[in-house]
């Protein structure tokens, strides 16, 4: 039995993916994102295709040999028993027949075992191909998002457009393959599919077009990052439309966008994680259940006690007490005599202006003037009303994931 094509294909795949497999065995290290080149992805896809062809040929050859063994066993059985009226002298000697049958049965069991192993390998490779297809889609989306505008014209764009069909052909994808593999609904669904590395991924909530998000994979599952403040590189004093659509750098400071957040949470209850950090390196993690309304509710954050009291929510909603979102040009806060977003800075779920504001002005050091400090990033119940925080991150996850963990 020849297995050279399969072994050769496996060597090609091993050579192409050795770095990837070794990285999966170690905890992910924080390092600048590196996107695989098209040549590397072509080599990986070619190795996968060659391995798949080799396994398929090996299975077909094994099936043929199995059929031959079955025919030999049938012939042996007929020869051992002999038809009625056959001269006993023409039959296989009694001492030899059991040995022949036992030998054939041993070979048959061995072949069956090999076939089962091959089927498992083929199924494993199919799952791996599907996962690689998703990775390639994510890489394409990342390149489209992060490539400078001047590289997105002319030769570079045309060359990239020509390479995509070639990649799909190498890994055996049809033009409609992406429809068969819908992007995950959120980072938790991506986690359930086996992804364990944090980073940028494409998701597609129900009823929404696909878009890129930052996923943080933890032992508790996949969390979708919806906000990050860390260095003041992005101005968060934005309009209602900007907060609705999202802004910033997905690899740095950013706001995902209220409409995207609402599409992720949908009608499901979600868990909101709030990560806070002060200027002395101290950190605080808060988690509480939320519902997020649509634009018709001013994207109200619907809370239950005691969190509602902590954030100053007093409006009654079907899911508890609610806080509508406000910006300088869309005032929905609970202060009738003041626009909190104008008085402070940034858009936020303001109560009476004094409970929290994680989208406030970023200070690289704590200002001396109290009037200036109140415009900063603060969470009153942790560091007080006039302490501007150094860094914050907001993450969401569906409630069913929290209940299952």
Swiss-Prot record:
Residues 1-23 form the signal peptide. GO terms for biological process: angiogenesis; blood coagulation; endothelial cell apoptotic process; lipid metabolic process; negative regulation of apoptotic process; negative regulation of endothelial cell apoptotic process; negative regulation of fatty acid biosynthetic process; negative regulation of very-low-density lipoprotein particle remodeling. Keywords: Angiogenesis, Coiled coil, Disulfide bond, Extracellular matrix, Glycoprotein, Lipid metabolism, Secreted, Signal. Residues 54-146 form a coiled coil. Residues 178-400 form the Fibrinogen C-terminal domain. SUPFAM superfamilies: Fibrinogen C-terminal domain-like. The record marks 163-164 as: Cleavage. Homooligomer; disulfide-linked via Cys residues in the N-terminal part of the protein. The homooligomer undergoes proteolytic processing to release its carboxyl fibrinogen-like domain, which circulates as a monomer. The homooligomer unprocessed form is able to interact with the extracellular matrix. This is Angiopoietin-related protein 4. It comes from Rattus norvegicus (Rat). The lineage of its organism: Eukaryota, Metazoa, Chordata, Craniata, Vertebrata. The gene is Angptl4.
